[in-house]
């Protein structure tokens, strides 16, 4: 059957049988009746068409009449007439005598001379009246063509301008020259010309008042143009006789007005559609039959109850393009749709109907706006109809079935009888509407991003359901809210946080689909789906809270999983039935409605708990006892560890015990060295010798001891050292981006957040007991834990500290991000990876390639082994927030976004119209932490000269290695990476001026840099310091501020602040600037000496080339 025959048959099927009129059949045949605008016939094209197009005139197409024979167009007749006239004139010329030719030629020359001086002014006058008439006609014309009957008074306007002048010249004594052709208008006395011009303006004004009153601005425009055209005729038509000048001017002016009025009467002038002609648009519509528009997902009106057991078999829409792994997982889901925990899923209960109706009312209000174009109105009507159909299929209903036992986040404990009367959470009003795209959540307020189900959820009420006992009652695996996608409003970033996604996790998905493979752990076997119950699929909670769960385990050796988890639930009812977390007792009563140990404010999942299990949970009193019991329970039930893993774990314990002793012995000496901004890290590496590979883990352990983070979050030393030992082993042995650089950045963020800051106001002076935040992102002071450094305290009340304004969880995330931020760095820039199509660049779409790779690789390492889980005592909300902060801090180190962060920070902290940093706002605190790690990442120029040159040597060597590889690959060598042509001093000075300097100045202007007060003498005229060194530092600081971007002035004070960081930055910048000036002087003198011949040592010539050059 051909395609046209199939289409015709389908279109015929749209007509219902006589007397039947079956609407369901007409709805499911794939076609729908509609109306469209017909195609408009193009007007005839030619010279006249282009003239009208230039004059903004739209030609109406001739009516289509196929029955009438084609006639000759008016343009054809005009061309024939002109041709006949030209032939007649040519015949007369050929028939005349030669003498008459000479007389005619002389007369023709005279005529051409007169016309050459007169045609241009006359044409200008005609055009002026033409465009004036078009303008006034457009402003006074009603809708539609041919409505400008009140504009014919404009024909009298040229007469008022010139005929009155003509009568004055004839009857009164004002001379207008001597009357012959050679007389020129300038011979007229000025007072006579001014009087005639005044008379012309009076006539025009009288015409405007009597004939057709206009607006004031239009009247002024007409008077100005009348005076202009009269002056043109008065000064430019001197070659014509005096009597012909006003007559011809009035005649051509009237012709221009007449032409404009004719065009407006017979044609339509285009103008902006201020009010769409809805009625005419509706009349031009023609009925058509078109294919029904379908989306790539199941229709919202096609509920699961009508999929089976009904005579309606809905048409299956086309599937999107998916990968092979996704297709396998989706196919498995389709086979499991009849499971009890799938019942009532996708019913739309998570949609707030009040919000949906509110949106529909807003669309209806938009439809009443007459200024909308027809296509927008049509789209809004379609949206309104879709929302109407969706609201009819999203009525909330109570699920009478017992939920299937799951392994997923706990929900609040509630009475099933109260479900029907309970209102939806206000936080879900605008964020719970389904959408085909995954949204991201920062996890800042406990909301969990729910994984969108990729299957078609169906519900067949005919299938018998399995009965479950009380002990198997747990959380919904895919409850009625599984289609909700929750978002956090007003978030600065869109990083995906690690969370318990509601939906089944398949075996091996975490490892086999992981984009980054760490070099420190082997591949994880994917296993098989055979003989696995849905509750066996691993979730993130397994790796975080059950150290015995290992992905490398064999499925054949696994115990009876349902029985095992049944034993767990029966033995300790205070454990979460889904993830094994404990229901912590410090959660307040106000939070019990919307938060829990795993999901926090994760929405209104209608989970049913029995009264017996609820009573058992209330009997637990001590949190420590519960955690010990849960760990013992997991250890007793764990039979998946192999002998090799057990022996390796024992070896790690012995190594860490000995390492702990070493760290305890060296803690005092190490923390003393770290208390200095110029941390002698290279001396420490040389002193450690063979143990220098442990510098990152030792410094990390020392900092956590100093700040008390180990005690606050109950971090186990064994897992802590296991992970950071593995993390530092993942850093490559390259000149700059190695474990020493990570340690230096870690020290810098610790120093910036724990050292005293002059003039900083502290908002907290004690420690809380919890780590929750309010729904609007503001902290609750009675529940937030803060840290303080044991090695340093504020000298007096005039000093403050960042650690007293930033919660402990956020500072711990900042420290961990500093240790992770260059993990597995290849020693190449982002630009190089993109240019060579490296796998990382392809994976991350050429955007922040290295930063995404560092974060993903470090977290992949953390999740690879249970003995790396040093955060096991964080609850789910805290871990989610922690992971989000770490990722955001690592991504902030991409210098391609440097100026975006700098502008945002200046607008928040240093703008005169800003309220400054609000420490109770989590977004402001996140911005401060991001700028802090950015400053720590490029702190080399702010160190003492020796350390600065050491770091410079490392980055230059690494960049030269990249330049060598680019040369070997035949690629153009990146700027400043060619060993043969170094431009070190110039680039270093530019890097400090444009990158490091503005960032440090902004951070200092915000009052966040550590320092100390310098007392100054009080004097009425001047302020001079007691110390000459302080004066010298002030002078250098002022010079630095002149060279770099000036920082906004803060409050005036008689005391000055000495900042060691800014002092070193000023010194280094001054030295590099002197080297640049010396080089320029040498070039001016023709000397080709290089920087190596200068008075500075060889190391002084090495330049810091930071990652800012990666994008050049």
UniProtKB/Swiss-Prot annotation:
Query: Which example biological process does GO assign this protein?
Result: negative regulation of cell adhesion
Please list the cofactors this protein needs: Mg(2+); Mn(2+)
Polar residues: bias regions:
428-445
Classify the main location: membrane
The catalytic activity of this protein is classed by the Enzyme Commission as 3.1.4.17
Question: Per its record, what are the GO molecular function terms?
Answer: 3',5'-cyclic-AMP phosphodiesterase activity; 3',5'-cyclic-GMP phosphodiesterase activity; 3',5'-cyclic-nucleotide phosphodiesterase activity; metal ion binding; protein kinase B binding
Instruction: Name the reported effect of residue 6 to A.
Output: Loss of interaction with RAPGEF3
User: TM spans, by residue?
Assistant: 88-108, 117-137, 152-172, 192-212, 220-240, 247-267
Map out region (Interaction with PIK3R6) in residue numbers: 436-460
| Name of the protein described by the UniProt record | cGMP-inhibited 3',5'-cyclic phosphodiesterase 3B
Species of origin: Homo sapiens
